[in-house]
Amino acid sequence: MGLEKSFLLFSLLVLVLGWVQPSLGVESRETQTQKFQRQHMDEEGHFPSSPTYCNQMMKSRGMTSGSCKPMNTFVHEPLETVQAICSQGQVTCKNGKRNCHKSSSTLRITDCRLKGSSKYPKCDYTTTDSQKHIIIACDVVHLDATV
């Protein structure tokens, strides 16, 4: 009888962890690169965007969980195009660091800005499409191994 009770408790624990663990959020398990892609890349996105694009994307990409992110930019270009910016013109970042690079050409982007009257949990954004240069921070090259 004790073994059956232990098995039942273990099964319940596994079931509860299965429900709780996903609610911890993808943000806690993602790398910086994955976070950048989630928050800023939308290669497949329609350009120009619909007026509700930002409301939909900000929510689906987890940027309205717990609070409304005030602003965000989505880039509608292949990831390889954005990664290649790291070999283009170096500029000083807003924080004073020198690991930022400016795109040599304009890219298709959508800016999302929280409307002034909007309050969590009903995050409401304005959607503005444009073609602009972007500046991204690139990590220092890391030598992982020699073989």
Swiss-Prot record:
<dbReference type="InterPro" id="IPR023412">
    <property type="entry name" value="RNaseA_domain"/>
</dbReference>
<dbReference type="Pfam" id="PF00074">
    <property type="entry name" value="RnaseA"/>
</dbReference>
<dbReference type="InterPro" id="IPR036816">
    <property type="entry name" value="RNaseA-like_dom_sf"/>
</dbReference>
<dbReference type="InterPro" id="IPR001427">
    <property type="entry name" value="RNaseA"/>
</dbReference>
<feature type="binding site">
    <location>
        <position position="38"/>
    </location>
    <ligand>
        <name>substrate</name>
    </ligand>
</feature>
<comment type="similarity">
    <text>Belongs to the pancreatic ribonuclease family.</text>
</comment>
<dbReference type="GO" id="GO:0003676">
    <property type="term" value="F:nucleic acid binding"/>
</dbReference>
<dbReference type="InterPro" id="IPR023411">
    <property type="entry name" value="RNaseA_AS"/>
</dbReference>
<dbReference type="GO" id="GO:0016829">
    <property type="term" value="F:lyase activity"/>
</dbReference>
<feature type="disulfide bond">
    <location>
        <begin position="93"/>
        <end position="100"/>
    </location>
</feature>
<feature type="binding site">
    <location>
        <begin position="69"/>
        <end position="73"/>
    </location>
    <ligand>
        <name>substrate</name>
    </ligand>
</feature>
<keyword id="KW-0732">Signal</keyword>
<feature type="disulfide bond">
    <location>
        <begin position="54"/>
        <end position="112"/>
    </location>
</feature>
<feature type="binding site">
    <location>
        <position position="94"/>
    </location>
    <ligand>
        <name>substrate</name>
    </ligand>
</feature>
<comment type="function">
    <text>Endonuclease that catalyzes the cleavage of RNA on the 3' side of pyrimidine nucleotides. Acts on single-stranded and double-stranded RNA.</text>
</comment>
<keyword id="KW-0255">Endonuclease</keyword>
<dbReference type="GO" id="GO:0050830">
    <property type="term" value="P:defense response to Gram-positive bacterium"/>
</dbReference>
<keyword id="KW-0964">Secreted</keyword>
<feature type="binding site">
    <location>
        <position position="113"/>
    </location>
    <ligand>
        <name>substrate</name>
    </ligand>
</feature>
<keyword id="KW-1015">Disulfide bond</keyword>
<feature type="disulfide bond">
    <location>
        <begin position="68"/>
        <end position="123"/>
    </location>
</feature>
<feature type="disulfide bond">
    <location>
        <begin position="86"/>
        <end position="138"/>
    </location>
</feature>
<comment type="subunit">
    <text>Monomer.</text>
</comment>
<dbReference type="GO" id="GO:0004522">
    <property type="term" value="F:ribonuclease A activity"/>
</dbReference>
<feature type="binding site">
    <location>
        <position position="35"/>
    </location>
    <ligand>
        <name>substrate</name>
    </ligand>
</feature>
<keyword id="KW-0456">Lyase</keyword>
<protein>
    <recommendedName>
        <fullName>Ribonuclease pancreatic gamma-type</fullName>
        <ecNumber>4.6.1.18</ecNumber>
    </recommendedName>
</protein>
<feature type="signal peptide">
    <location>
        <begin position="1"/>
        <end position="25"/>
    </location>
</feature>
<dbReference type="GO" id="GO:0005576">
    <property type="term" value="C:extracellular region"/>
</dbReference>
<feature type="active site" description="Proton donor">
    <location>
        <position position="142"/>
    </location>
</feature>
<keyword id="KW-0378">Hydrolase</keyword>
<feature type="active site" description="Proton acceptor">
    <location>
        <position position="40"/>
    </location>
</feature>
<keyword id="KW-0540">Nuclease</keyword>
